[in-house]
């Protein structure tokens, strides 16, 4: 059941259905949907941002008014996870320099971490993306944001691709990436590190773009009761849809796998 006051909600429903009132009804349904997707913790400011991102044009005061009218409010005491502050041990220069379209696979990879809400708690996802095809070549999901999550994602990428030449691996300056373990892994596998400038998310725009797609096309449409449900659904999105089927404008409207296959077919015919 929603934490909504029935008397206020049903009294409001019985008002004359003016054009404005009908628009408010539709908007309130969207507000309730975003509120549910947040685990019932979002207030009017965050829900306004979700509405804006979905293409809905409305003022923040209108969202506040409608939420107050039907009794929807944020649940306090439930905060988003914060990245732990670690010592910035080793920071690599920004060697990628926003060169997001290499000429071949396994020239440049980008990596990043995001978090997913479940009723059991937070779940963290690290991915490695090949910039040539936008394919997710490595990923790892854990309930804690430790160094292992980024190392496991990169290990999967190395195992799957087995690059025969040095690959540039770009990340932000999160503590997982500035650790000695990360730098040691890069060196031992013949990889070269690159990092975004501090506080500049556009330096890692492709990884950010994938997370936006994942959340818009899958996560925001679901409410995960358990971490295992989320893991299974994210596996399905990455391996069964995104890599093999999802078309990309940057890849001539082909999926990442199709785009790479076409590249190797052309290479073999030369």
Descriptions of predicted regions:
Residues 1-270:
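Charged DNA-binding/catalytic regions of mobile-element recombinases
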């Amino acid at each position: 059941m929603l934490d909504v006051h029935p008397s206020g909600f049903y009294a409001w429903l019985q008002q004359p259905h003016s054009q404005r009132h009908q628009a408010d009804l539709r908007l309130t349904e969207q507000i309730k949907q975003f509120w549910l997707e947040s685990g019932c913790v979002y207030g009017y400011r965050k829900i306004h941002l979700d509405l804006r991102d979905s293409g809905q044009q409305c003022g923040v005061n209108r969202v506040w008014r409608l939420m107050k009218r039907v009794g929807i409010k944020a649940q306090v005491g439930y905060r988003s996870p914060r990245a732990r502050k670690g010592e910035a041990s080793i920071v690599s220069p920004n060697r990628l320099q926003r060169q997001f379209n290499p000429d071949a696979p396994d020239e440049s990879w980008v990596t990043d971490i995001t978090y997913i809400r479940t009723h059991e708690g937070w779940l963290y996802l690290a991915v490695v993306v090949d910039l040539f095809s936008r394919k997710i070549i490595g990923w790892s999901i854990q309930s804690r944001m430790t160094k292992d999550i980024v190392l496991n994602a990169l290990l999967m990428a190395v195992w799957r691709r087995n690059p025969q030449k040095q690959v540039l691996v770009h990340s932000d300056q999160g503590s997982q990436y500035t650790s000695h373990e990360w730098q040691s892994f890069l060196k031992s596998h013949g990889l070269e590190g690159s990092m975004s400038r501090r506080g500049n998310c556009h330096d890692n725009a492709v990884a950010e773009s994938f997370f936006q797609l994942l959340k818009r096309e899958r996560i925001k449409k679901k409410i995960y009761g358990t971490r295992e449900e989320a893991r299974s659904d994210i596996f399905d999105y990455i391996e069964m849809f995104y890599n093999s089927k999802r078309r990309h404008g940057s890849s001539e409207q082909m999926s990442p796998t199709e785009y790479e296959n076409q590249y190797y077919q052309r290479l073999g015919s030369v």
